[in-house]
Amino acid sequence: MSFISDIKTVKEKDPSVRSSIGIILTHNGMHAVWIYRVSRLFWKVRLKLVAKIISNVGRFFTGVEIHPGAQIGKNFMIDHGTGTVIGETSVIGNNVLLYHQVTLGGTGNDKGNKRHPSLCDNVMVAAGAKILGNIHIGTNAKIGANAVVLK
């Protein structure tokens, strides 16, 4: 978990960012990622109730829901963020960028342990896209705005 690395990622990927202090104080998506990273620490040591409480507080303040069970790689960024949902068994690689109102969710049909999507490295998912179910999105993929991906 590197807050410094997260700040560098936002500076590289978001052209509207002017300063590190601006990210720390106002970048909604980054706040959500930081809250996720803290909740994930509690999840990994089996303090799941604490992790879920932290996650819910984060959702209240940011409008972004990231389940603490999700696995997220380095240099992950959510731009704008509000309405984004990342499910419990989602796996997200390195250098992934999500825009607002993206859902990495389940379909209700997958009854096994893995119910949510896996995104490889260098994936970009545009605003409003829904990626549902236990599916695999390959390296360097770009998912368009408002796309619904089921297979």
Please identify what each model-predicted range represents.
Residues T62, H67-P68, G73-K74, D79-E88, ...:
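Left-handed beta-helix
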Residues M1-T62:
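Terminal amphipathic alpha-helical/low-complexity segments used for targeting or macromolecular assembly
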